[in-house]
């Protein structure tokens, strides 16, 4: 399995409703990406203070790399990604992606 972790540094002006709409768009991809197992999202709750300014995020679990790669190319993912970039501080520099085999 692949765990696809995405950490976000939203602009201060990004409203909670916009954040939720972004997460809803990611969750909706489960309906069109076979092998997309699970999505979790929310704010960082770590007390360590080592978040690098990334205060929100989501984690997607895929059956394998092939499914992950299909998700990355899917038009709905591309649209959600563009929405994320518009909502994050510094555009792409406000997004951190980390994938690992689990």
Regions from the PLM with identified roles:
Residues 75-76, 102:
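Short, solvent-exposed aromatic-acidic interface loops
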């Amino acid at each position: 399995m692949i765990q696809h972790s995405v950490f976000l540094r939203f602009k201060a002006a990004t409203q909670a409703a916009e954040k939720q709409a972004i997460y809803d768009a990611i969750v909706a991809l489960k309906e069109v990406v076979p092998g997309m197992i699970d999505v979790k999202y929310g704010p960082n709750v770590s007390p360590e203070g080592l978040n690098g300014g990334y205060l929100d995020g989501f984690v997607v679990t895929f059956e394998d790399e092939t499914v992950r790669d299909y998700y990355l190319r899917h038009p709905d993912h591309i649209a959600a990604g563009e929405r994320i970039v518009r909502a994050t501080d510094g555009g792409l520099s406000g997004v951190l992606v980390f994938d690992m085999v689990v």
